[in-house]
């Protein structure tokens, strides 16, 4: 179904069965598959392929040569009807690739709201990208990676499969991330190691001085005290009890499956 207010360039192909919402603009030489849904106000510039069981929300802008919903690169994939789900108000720049999920997970690759995926960024099968995230040019997420809200992944950075990048993390460019990065941390290098907390980013997002002091104290316990994780957990839990901003930092320990960067 194509809404009457949608504008589709005559050189583009929209297969029967696709759902195109109100005010959608599809530029020249795009291909939209039969199982695709595109929400109102979304713009596809030109030369874009949206394939598979893919849902794109409202008011997104997708730039030329992006590929969304194509078959993933997992060798076990056998053509199962897995999906891509993208939220609202995302900017997906030139040559970005977002692949559909696998049945080995829940079958869905997810991108939330208000994200910026810069040129050549890659979101592999079963990844979950939260809200307000930035993937800079050529940032690459392997399969099953989780990127929490407000995280920034620098250009030319690769994140190993099954890693989790915590909220408000900043990963510097040209890094290789092979373990989980706790919330609020700056990580850099190959393999990535911690370089303090993302102070500027947290200030911009309205964290109070008291909260920043508490987050810094938790960071120092984890990374500078010389103690083991089991030894510092009770101390960080005490800080989190008094300062709720530290709770995501503490909770991340239980979420981690690949171990924390060190």
From Swiss-Prot:
Its EC number is 2.3.1.129. Keywords: Acyltransferase, Cytoplasm, Lipid A biosynthesis, Lipid biosynthesis, Lipid metabolism, Repeat, Transferase. InterPro entries: Acetyltransf_C (IPR029098), Acetyltransf_C_sf (IPR037157), Hexapep (IPR001451), Hexapep_transf_CS (IPR018357), Lipid_A_LpxA (IPR010137), Trimer_LpxA-like_sf (IPR011004). Pfam families: Acetyltransf_11, Hexapep. Its main location: cytoplasm. It is an enzyme of class 2 (transferase). It is found in: Cytoplasm. GO terms for biological process: lipid A biosynthetic process. It catalyses: a (3R)-hydroxyacyl-[ACP] + UDP-N-acetyl-alpha-D-glucosamine = a UDP-3-O-[(3R)-3-hydroxyacyl]-N-acetyl-alpha-D-glucosamine + holo-[ACP]. Pathway: Glycolipid biosynthesis; lipid IV(A) biosynthesis; lipid IV(A) from (3R)-3-hydroxytetradecanoyl-[acyl-carrier-protein] and UDP-N-acetyl-alpha-D-glucosamine: step 1/6. GO terms for molecular function: acyl-[acyl-carrier-protein]-UDP-N-acetylglucosamine O-acyltransferase activity. GO terms for cellular component: cytoplasm; membrane. Involved in the biosynthesis of lipid A, a phosphorylated glycolipid that anchors the lipopolysaccharide to the outer membrane of the cell. Belongs to the transferase hexapeptide repeat family. LpxA subfamily. Homotrimer. This is Acyl-[acyl-carrier-protein]--UDP-N-acetylglucosamine O-acyltransferase. It comes from Erwinia tasmaniensis (strain DSM 17950 / CFBP 7177 / CIP 109463 / NCPPB 4357 / Et1/99). The gene is lpxA.
């Amino acid at each position: 179904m194509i809404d009457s207010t949608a504008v589709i360039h005559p050189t583009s192909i929209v297969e029967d069965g696709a759902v195109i919402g109100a005010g959608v603009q599809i530029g020249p030489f795009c291909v939209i598959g039969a199982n695709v849904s595109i929400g109102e106000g979304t713009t596809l510039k030109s030369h874009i392929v949206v394939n598979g069981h893919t849902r794109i929300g409202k008011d997104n802008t997708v730039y030329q040569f992006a590929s969304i919903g194509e078959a993933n690169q997992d060798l076990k994939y056998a053509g199962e009807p897995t999906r891509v789900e993208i939220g609202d108000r995302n900017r997906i720049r030139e040559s970005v690739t977002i692949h559909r999920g696998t049945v080995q997970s829940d079958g869905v690759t997810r991108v939330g709201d208000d994200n910026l995926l810069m040129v050549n960024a890659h979101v592999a099968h079963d990844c979950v990208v939260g809200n307000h995230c930035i993937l800079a040019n050529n940032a690459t997420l392997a399969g099953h990676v989780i990127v929490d809200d407000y995280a920034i992944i620098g250009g030319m950075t690769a994140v190993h499969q099954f890693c989790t990048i915590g909220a408000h993390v900043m990963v510097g460019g040209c890094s290789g991330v092979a373990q989980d990065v706790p919330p609020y941390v700056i990580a850099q290098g190959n393999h990535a190691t911690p370089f303090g907390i993302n102070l500027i980013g947290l200030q911009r997002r309205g964290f109070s001085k008291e909260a920043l002091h508490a987050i810094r104290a938790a960071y120092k316990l984890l990374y500078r005290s010389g103690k083991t994780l089991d030894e510092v957990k009770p101390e960080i839990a005490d800080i989190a009890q008094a300062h709720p901003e530290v709770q995501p930092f503490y909770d991340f320990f239980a979420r981690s499956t690949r171990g924390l960067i060190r």
